A protein has these predicted regions:
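Structured beta-strand-rich core segments of catalytic domains in phosphoester-bond hydrolases
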Residues: 54-142
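N-terminal, active-site-proximal structural segment of metallo-dependent hydrolase catalytic domains
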Residues: 1-77, 81-91
Length: 142
């Protein structure tokens, strides 16, 4: 089984330009130009299970399109996507923040999928995917 974990950084880009016109200004940029390049990269890797952290699940950045669903559709996989912030988190009440998520894409049958939240920290999501021969946990600590 080939497992890949990738930090999408919401598909907004990387490098020095990410910090223009002000530090972390790229965080607010649209993601359309980068998403198809990422899909090509993921296709080349041929991962059976693809964990994605820092994805956009439908804010203005991604033109209100869930990046995990789009990538899964392009790769012929099944998406499991959840907001990074728990139901009681005030971060989850902010429009842009509540669309920040993690995802797991899988081409194999998924027997069970669950979300757990850690007691402490800002990003508390733990995603659990049960496959035929293995259970996978996706966690992005910050």
């Amino acid at each position: 089984m080939r497992l890949m974990l990738y930090n999408m950084r919401y598909g907004t880009g990387t490098g020095f330009k990410f910090h223009l016109p002000f530090p972390f200004g790229g965080f607010f940029r649209k993601t359309g130009k980068n998403l198809d390049a990422l899909v090509r990269f993921f296709r080349e890797q041929k991962a059976d299970v693809l964990g994605l952290v820092e994805i956009d699940s439908g804010s203005y950045r991604s033109s209100h399109r869930n990046q995990a669903n789009y990538i899964a559709w392009k790769l012929g996989q099944h998406p499991f996507c959840r907001s990074k912030y728990g139901h009681r988190s005030w971060w989850g009440r902010l429009p842009l923040m509540r669309k920040q998520a993690n995802a797991c894409l899988c081409g194999q049958p998924v027997l069970n999928q669950r979300s757990h939240f850690l007691r402490k920290g800002v990003k508390r999501l733990v995603m659990e995917l049960e496959l035929q021969e293995v259970v996978i946990f996706i966690v992005h600590l910050a």
